[in-house]
């Protein structure tokens, strides 16, 4: 859980991508007319060839970002930081252009908070490392063993990796790769990161002025909403937290999730209200960034959707040079990325995204018709995206549904720099 910073980079000209999307749509319409006339059956999945996989994942279990103001504090022992031997895998971090790793203001902030026991706030633990290794093993089973899609050893020509410039995400990526490739590699592992003020792998409230302004009023009044307000007061009273302490459902959930993931002794009342705390954290998030507020959702994850979309279009474009396409794209993100991302795709289940959760996007081509399809999985379960007839979605239908929220870098910067913005929710 973080509050982010936004701006955007991309590699393919917008005009080219638009033309590709239009041609794809026209071809799809023509095929649909033929199929309707001939009364053809649904797509034969045995004739589908996997062409590309994109995986967005949340980091593994970590220490809380901010301790609760309680007399009895949970002890976070540095032994929890021991690195499991099977997760050891060397990597290098660069900026998006391949230059030196950018400075990480978030890691500096986390090191200002020392928890009882000696750990810093927001540190990936061995539990989190094992979770990420297990996710990597699942991906290996899916794309190396069950389907011989990826090489069994890491090949930099097949895999592109990008992470937010936060240490727990970089280390989570290391562990995932160790599980996926069993610590075997044919070349250097490069993890690409961006500057905090231009990051788009999370909603960048710090740099996107309009997003910050549109949601400011709702952030200030979220804890005062009917239902949320009463439940927050009840939890704080039962836990002995003073009403003046700035503790909301986000902070409560952050602590209860971290403690439960590590089986640490917790405040009994925190455990008792765990389910309600999660639900109210979700309610609060949806109040701040509601699905009806299209522009805010666009600014929150539109640039990231644009990256995912561009990868899809480049993969299906025969003119794209082979060295510009990877079989696997990995993106290390956060819970605050997942909620708006899942909302825009129409698959949010109203549960807080857990540690090490993944959203996997597969791109297929039909061997006979040459048509393209997308398949989505969240937390390992097949999903039906908004605007799609079923789990196996024609690419043009998927892109059309995404286009409601996708933002090119130019449009993103234009929206973020608007000077006249009504603060959503301030007039309620």
From Swiss-Prot:
Transmembrane segments: none annotated. GO terms for biological process: hematopoietic progenitor cell differentiation; lysobisphosphatidic acid metabolic process; phosphatidic acid biosynthetic process; phospholipid metabolic process. GO terms for molecular function: acid phosphatase activity; lysophosphatidic acid phosphatase activity. Highly expressed in kidney, heart, small intestine, muscle, liver, prostate, testis, ovary and weakly expressed in thymus and colon. Residues 58-168 are annotated as: Substrate binding. Disulfide bonds: none annotated. Changing residue 59 to A: Abolishes enzyme activity. It catalyses: a phosphate monoester + H2O = an alcohol + phosphate; 1-(9Z-octadecenoyl)-sn-glycero-3-phosphate + H2O = 1-(9Z-octadecenoyl)-sn-glycerol + phosphate. This is Lysophosphatidic acid phosphatase type 6. It comes from Homo sapiens (Human). The lineage of its organism: Eukaryota, Metazoa, Chordata, Craniata, Vertebrata. The gene is ACP6.
